[in-house]
Amino acid sequence: HPKRHAMEGTFTLGCDENGIFTGLDCEIYFDTGAYASLCGPVLERACTHSVGPYCYQNTDIRGYGYYTNNPPAGAFRGFGVCQSEFALESNINLLAEKVGISPWEIRYRNAIEPGKVLPNGQIADCSTALKETLLAVKDAYESNPGRAGIACAMKNAGVGVGLPDKGRAKLIVHDGRVELYSAASDIGQGCATVFVQMVAETTGLGKEKIRNMGANSEVAPDSGTTSGSRQTLITGEAVR
């Protein structure tokens, strides 16, 4: 099975005297090995997430995938985002040092807020709470110099790219218990357990009163693919 893409890239990040980001220029190269596999979609995610959860005045992001005689690379946890986010966060730490402010402070000043627009055109909705999250860890970070690090990242969930996405579930009360039917495949990520927890939380019932009937497409509604970290988010909301 293909694993994570090896990445090389150049990230150039600029800011003003107050640490406010003025621009980001990225050039990303992915080694996809001997076969393309999912290099295209993975590279797309690496590029769209290379800006992180921050505001910018200007951005220019370019990504390239190339064949080599190495083993194939493809879909792997994080789907390209880990590589570009690591490069950006490392750059932010270096920039904070040059400006003379803390790594926490430069992230707080540039954090995306509700109503602001990410470089990919997405408007941050009311659930965006990056600044609140940074405030929650500020004391722990600043009271442990040299031992605690800090970084921010975002990751899409679901199929994305504007395609319709849906999840379905069916709940039946039988012999005093709730039977949960969903065709979502649990391949180790734990969605079968999460669905039961969501029913228990929503109804107030004990988990012993809820039974997950397993992924059986003959009796359960179509819940879509197990990919893109989407089952808990999409089918989970149907369960709720």
Task: Go through each PLM region and give its residues.
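Flexible glycine/proline-rich, aromatic-decorated loop/lid segments
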Residues: 30, 59-65, 170-172, 206-230
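Alpha-helical support elements that line or immediately flank enzyme active sites
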Residues: 41-49, 77-105, 132, 136, ...
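Glycine-rich and small/hydrophobic secondary-structure elements
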Residues: 1-17, 73-98, 119-142, 223-240
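Short acidic (Asp/Glu) and glycine-rich catalytic loops that position anionic groups and cofactors
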Residues: 67-72, 110-118, 175-178, 219-227
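Helix-loop-helix junctions that connect adjacent transmembrane helices in secondary transporters/permeases
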Residues: 110-177
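Beta-strand segments within the central parallel beta-sheet cores of soluble alpha/beta enzyme folds
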Residues: 1, 22-27, 103-112, 145-153, ...
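Flexible loop/turn segments at secondary-structure boundaries
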Residues: 1, 31-35, 113-118, 157-161, ...
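Glycine-rich loop/linker segments at domain edges
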Residues: 6-90, 159-165, 233
